[in-house]
A protein has these predicted regions:
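Short glycine-/acidic-enriched loop or helix-start segments at secondary-structure transitions
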Residues: 49-51, 112-114, 138
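Short beta-strand segments
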Residues: 40, 70, 103-105, 128, ...
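ATP/NTP phosphate-donor binding region
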Residues: 1-100
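Glycine-rich nucleotide phosphate-binding loop and flanking beta-alpha elements
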Residues: 46-47, 108-110, 173
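Active-site and donor-binding regions of nucleotide-sugar-utilizing enzymes
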Residues: 95-127
Length: 183
């Protein structure tokens, strides 16, 4: 496993890169001592990676309440209405200030889960598990979060850094060739 540190004076965070690193999510989360965990994913990624991610979390943190919020897939769903679904899932989980949101997906999921984390109780922690090439090299790094409006992309958002990013290159094998060539 390779570790890089994004050095941002007040809000630095590590990026862990390596085959199988997705299965380390539980042990990495245990370092944060979360009271509750909400995994946000989509219908495409969810059926591929929700089980290994939640299994890792439950093994490391068996007493911590865990919920999964599965959203429809695609940029057209990067809306305030979809964001509300994440916030509703956080409410149903009784997420508090010590809870953590896990973004499991590409850039759309990372943007929305990060924005939800920035809004919930004026900011709770979140982590990124990017599953597309573009999200691994761009959107999961830098803290840009937000949702779209009909008038334009990312009109509502915030800069909000994750606590850490887990990049597993193995997940790219499940992407269609078109996604890889698109970056």
């Amino acid at each position: 496993m390779i570790e890089y540190n994004v050095d941002l004076a007040s809000r630095s965070y590590p990026i862990y890169i390596g085959k199988g690193v997705i299965e380390r999510i539980g042990s990495e989360l245990s370092e944060l001592n979360p009271t509750r965990i909400l995994v946000v994913t989509n219908t495409t990624v969810g059926h591929l990676y929700t089980v290994p991610v939640t299994r890792s979390i439950q093994r490391a943190l068996p007493e911590v309440p865990l919920a999964v919020c599965t959203l429809k897939d695609g940029e057209i769903y990067k809306t305030p209405e979809t964001l509300r679904q994440i916030l509703q899932a956080a409410a149903e989980l009784h997420a508090d200030r010590a809870s953590v949101i896990v973004a499991l997906g590409g850039g759309v999921i990372g943007d929305m889960a990060g924005f939800a984390a920035s809004m919930w109780m004026r900011g709770i922690r979140f982590v990124q598990i990017p599953t597309t090439l573009l999200s691994q090299v761009d959107s999961s790094v830098g803290g840009k979060t937000g949702v779209n409006l009909p008038q334009g992309k990312n009109l509502i958002g915030a800069f909000y850094q994750p606590k850490f990013v887990l990049i597993d290159p193995r997940v790219l094998k499940t992407l269609p060739a078109r996604e890889i060539s698109a970056g």
